[in-house]
Amino acid sequence: MSAKVVLKDFLSQAPIDKLKATLSGHLPVSCITMDAKITSLQPGYHFLFFSLASPESNLNSDGYESLYSPKPNNPFSFKRRIWLHGVLRFHRPLHLFQTSECHELIQEESVKSPSITKEVEACLPKSSFLTKPTSEKQTKHVYIRRKIYDSQHQLCIEEDRTLAYLNRQELAIPKTLRSKSIPQHSWVFTPTPIMVFRYSALMFNAHMIHWNATYATKSENYPNLVLPGPLLVTSMLEYFRSVYPQMSKNMKRFEFRLLSPAFVNQPLRICISETGNLWIDRFTTDLDPPSLIARGRVYT
């Protein structure tokens, strides 16, 4: 499967103000107040723009865009989708108050193996039961390559993202992952259902695991609503900018990997090491080290 789409959007201040309101009370105050005079999109703000606006009839049964899923005529029947990893590249400022274009290339690839990859297995929810496995153990990866141009058709931002679609019904208990780095800076916050709903609305993202608790817990066996991947990425980038504002201005690339789902009402900790590594883990007051949710790296 391969598809191309061009998404046009006017880059206004309004979605950014709504993002600040969404993050207010969760991230440091400096994250909310540091952009009083910005004239261009900051790292991660492009997630607020260039969303597909498909009618409901074009969405999958879980509310997600069918364009980013395996083709309907494909015999692969996925049970769950997972955002695995991505790369953001920043070439030049993308200024506000102009019409910009995002060119997307969507490609599908099958990954056949006797068992799903470790990175996918680590993202599966815990369950009190195991159902019968499907006849074909297979994972499909959907690669989305995005190139964002300004009104002068200059390339400003590139984004690569990888989604995984699982063709198995049985659930695995994820292994606990821990960071080997020591945080030099950290911030703890507890995402709420309202925070997740607001961010999903800003992205025009109707994926039901983010806003429908009954669907998330009963249909996909998660313990609660799931945080969107872009929200985790944005939180890391915003906290990094608040700690290292000058370095953020010279950011050329950001690589990230999502290792385990994060849920509402679960305390999370954003960390930055002295070497520039970022990660999010489940914050705990227990003696056991917190387990990793996501990790990233800034390159300047």
Swiss-Prot record:
Known EC number: 4.2.1.-
MF GO annotations: (3R)-hydroxyacyl-[acyl-carrier-protein] dehydratase activity; oxidoreductase activity
Compartment list: Mitochondrion
Class of the enzyme per the UniProt entry, highest EC level: lyase
Segments crossing the lipid bilayer: none
Matching InterPro entries: HotDog_dom_sf, Mitochondrial_HTD2
Keywords from the named record: Lyase, Mitochondrion, NAD, Oxidoreductase
Entry similarity comment: Belongs to the HTD2 family.
Function description: Mitochondrial 3-hydroxyacyl-thioester dehydratase involved in fatty acid biosynthesis. Required for respiratory growth and for normal mitochondrial morphology.
The name this protein goes by in its record: Hydroxyacyl-thioester dehydratase type 2, mitochondrial
Species: Schizosaccharomyces pombe (strain 972 / ATCC 24843)
